[in-house]
């Protein structure tokens, strides 16, 4: 029985290893897919109620002449299976741009197929193509699978830096103060 299970597993892996994985830039028509991925990621990160965007907002922003973000969609056998949403940043010290990865997500049933690595490879290529020098992102300290994945790629944490954020009433209060 174990031999049969192993044979089935090998057939499955051979079949799926030959399936085409493609990466492409997102368009307005991908807004629903991106939104679903954002919701899935928020649930995984234990923040399902923190999402305040919508499919229509994403569609509108993707349709702008200069969208506020870029997004790469991964497809496996023409099925959307993951995404990387990013924007460009700039280092005054280096005098060059980079990419900040806002979200990286691969649907659970597609994990283990190097899709996440392919998405990051594409972003690294975009960074270098623009003369940039770094690709950076944040990861929740409890997300050990993601941390291991990033370490395997050669990424290193910026332990001396802490992310700070102004939102909501604190942001508004700062604007109103003179």
Give residue ranges: language-model regions.
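Conserved beta-strand-loop-alpha-helix junction that forms the acyl-donor binding cleft
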Residues: 137-146, 165-169
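A short beta-loop-alpha structural element at the N-terminal edge
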Residues: 22-36
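Conserved active-site alpha-helix within GNAT-family acetyltransferase domains
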Residues: 117, 121, 129, 141-160, ...
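Conserved GNAT-fold acetyl-CoA-binding loop/helix
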Residues: 35-61
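A short, internal acetyl-CoA/4′-phosphopantetheine-binding micro-motif in the GNAT/acyltransferase core
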Residues: 104-111
